[in-house]
A protein has these predicted regions:
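Acidic, glycine/proline-rich low-complexity segments that act as flexible tails and inter-domain linkers
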Residues: 1-71, 86
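Electropositive phosphate-/nucleotide-binding environments in soluble metabolic enzymes
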Residues: 2-5, 15-22, 32-39, 73, ...
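Short beta-strand segments at enzyme active-site cores
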Residues: 20-21, 91-93, 201
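Hydrophobic pocket-lining residues that define ligand/cofactor binding sites across diverse proteins
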Residues: 28, 83, 191
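Conserved short-loop catalytic and cofactor-binding motifs
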Residues: 29, 95-96, 171-175
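Glycine-rich anion-binding loops and their surrounding alpha/beta cores
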Residues: 43, 47-52, 72, 87, ...
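Core alpha/beta catalytic barrel or barrel-like domain that forms the active/cofactor pocket
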Residues: 55-63, 91-97, 159-162
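A generic, well-ordered mixed alpha/beta core segment in the N-terminal half of proteins
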Residues: 64, 68-125
Length: 202
């Protein structure tokens, strides 16, 4: 797990070439990521994120791993907006589509939601409308080294699994959808080692 953590940090900090990063990610995928490796990666990513401060009380993220390869409906975004309309405080963290036709950012942008929300805007948005969307590239500058590699590989990697776990607002609750049943235990065990108070992995 320590070697995997060091490799992940090297990718995040741009110390690996694209070829090296691709081999590392493929190796982890073939071996199978462990909850401890995932927990280390979560900590490394959150440590490099633009953190959201000053949130009080409970809030939830509704998010999915994506990558099911079926061009399926983005139900996490619809669910998040429904919960916000019901009065729950939703701080959704997401990105544009990588392996599908519509990621959460694409859907919300199409509905007129801004993608340029800054860390200091999140509390106000939650107070005003119970909903804030954190566009991942604005909060994870170190991920700029990762996007081209993910697109070139074109398959699920550690980063598909990691994205839903690294909300810089550090919500107290999470509803996490997975693309395949075999991912449920891995992500549930990873969340057990995180800051999340309550989680449902479906």
């Amino acid at each position: 797990a320590d070697m995997a953590a060091a490799g992940f940090a090297d990718i995040m900090d741009g110390r690996m070439t694209p070829a090296q990063a691709g081999c590392f990610l493929m190796g982890l995928r073939m071996k199978g990521e462990t909850p401890l490796e995932m927990a280390h990666a979560v900590g490394i990513a959150l440590g490099r994120a633009n953190r959201v401060e000053g949130l009080e009380g409970d809030c939830i993220d509704v998010v999915g791993t994506g990558g099911d390869g079926r061009n399926s409906f983005n139900c996490s975004t619809a669910t998040a907006l429904t919960l916000a309309g019901m009065g729950y405080r939703v701080v959704k963290h997401g990105n544009r589509a990588v392996s599908s036709s519509c990621g959460s950012a694409d859907a919300l942008e199409g509905l007129g939601f801004p993608l340029d929300v800054a860390p200091e805007d999140v509390r106000r948005l939650l107070d005003e409308r119970n909903f804030a969307f954190l566009f991942a590239p604005n909060f994870h500058p170190s991920f700029r080294n990762v996007g081209p590699i993910r697109r070139e590989l074109g398959i699920r990697t550690l980063f598909n699994l990691l994205g839903p776990l690294i909300n810089p607002a550090r919500p107290t609750h999470i509803l996490l959808g997975v693309a395949r049943p075999e991912l449920v235990e891995l992500l549930a065990e990873t969340l057990r080692q995180s800051h999340i108070r309550k989680a449902a992995v479906v």
